Amino acid sequence: MNAPDRLTTHNEFKNHDLVDDTGKPGVRYEKRPARRPDGSEAPGLYNAWITLDNPTQYNSYTTDMVKGVILAMRAASNARDVNCVVFTGAGDKAFCTGGNTKEYAEYYAGQPQEYRQYMRLFNDMVSSILACDKPVICRVNGMRIGGGQEIGMACDFSVSSDLARYGQAGPKHGSAPIGGATDFLPVAVGAERAMAACVLCEPFSAHKAYQMGILTDVVPALKVDGKFVANPLVETQRQFDEFGRNAYGEPKTGDALKEGKAMMARGSVDLSMLDARVEELCAKILLTFPDCTTKTLEELRKPKLEAWNRNKEDARAWLALNMMTEARSGFTAFNEGTKDDREIDFVLLRQKLAAGQSWVGPLHDEIQPKAKRAA
C-alpha cells in the first residue's frame, strides 16, 4: 500500500535558527560524519562537535564564547541531520576552567549591572545545553573546574580522560558555585558530597568523579613506553585503605607520588582512547529512535531542570551584587597574583570584617596577594 501524498518527504524545510551564522571567537562548531558501531559512515548523518577553543587560558569562556556556545547548541538542536552533540575543549589540558578571570577582573569587577547582563548569557548557555533536542556528550579532555564543571554537569553524558581533574572554585576565588553546581551536584551525589565539593573547593580525580556518579566512563590517556597506563598520580589498585576508608581515586602521597610523577614525565598524553569511547557512545545513540530518545532526555533532565529553573534568577542577582565585594577581590587576586599565590589573605579579611571594617575603603587592596608579598 502506497503512503498518502501528505506524508511524502519535504523537499524544502523551514529554517528555525535564530541566526544563520553560529561563529563566535573561541568556539568551533563542526559536523563530523556519524558512524555505525562497526565504524562505517552513516551517509547524511552527523555528530555536532562544539569546541571551546581558548587553550592558552585553559578554555575559560569569554563573553563572546558564551554567546558562541548558545548559538552552537541551538544550531545542533535544530539540525535534522545531527545525531548527538559532543561538547569539548581544545588541547589536552582542560575541557573548561570556568569564566575568564582576566575578563572578570579587568571589566566586570565593580560593575554589577554589567555582570548581571553577562549572567543572563551564562544562564542561557546552561539552559541551551539542558534544552538541546539531541543528547549532549561532554568529552572531558582535561580539567573541568568551576564554571566548566557546571556546564559539564548540564550535559547528558560525560566521558573523561583519567588525567582530568574536577571541582569547584567559587568560595576560594570570590564567588559561589551557583551557576549549576549547587543545583546539579546534590541531585547527582547527595547533600554531603555536594557540600564538601562546593564549600571546600578541593579538586578530585576523574576516577573519584566516576565513583561519585557524575561520569559515564573514564579512559586512560597517558602512554608510557607505547602502552596506555592508568593515571599514576592517583590510587587505582585498591578500594580501601587500612582503616576502611575509600582509597580509590584519591591522590597518592610520599614515595608513591614521586614514582607517579616520574612516570608522568616519561609518558605522553594520547586522547585516542577518549575519542574512540566518545565515538562508541555516539554510535550507540545512533541506533535508537530519535523522538523516543529526545523524550527520554527530557524526562531524565527534569531533576536538574527543576533545581536550575528554581534558582537561576536569584543566583544571577546575587552574583551581580557580589561583584562589588568578594568577587572583585577574588578575581583581581587570581588575575594579578603569581602562579603559586592567587588567593587573598582569607584570615586577614575575616579579622577586618569582624572588627567592623567596611568594603568601602582600602580593604580590597589590603587583602591582595601583592600586599602579602610587600609586608
Task: Give residue spans per PLM region.
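Glycine- (often His-adjacent) and acidic-residue-rich active-site loop
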Residues: D5-R6, H10-D21, G89-M125, R144, ...
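C-terminal alpha-helix plus adjacent terminal tail
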Residues: M1-Y46, R80, D92, S205-H207, ...
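Hydrophobic alpha-helical segments typical of transmembrane helices
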Residues: L121-M125, A181-F184, R193, K295, ...
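Short amphipathic alpha-helices within nucleic acid-binding modules
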Residues: Y58-Y61
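Crotonase-fold acyl-CoA enzyme core
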Residues: S128-G147, I151-P290
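Hydrophobic alpha-helical membrane-association signature
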Residues: M65-V69, Y118-L121, L274
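A structural preference for short, pocket-lining loop segments at secondary-structure junctions
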Residues: E41-D53, K67-G110, S127-V140, F157, ...
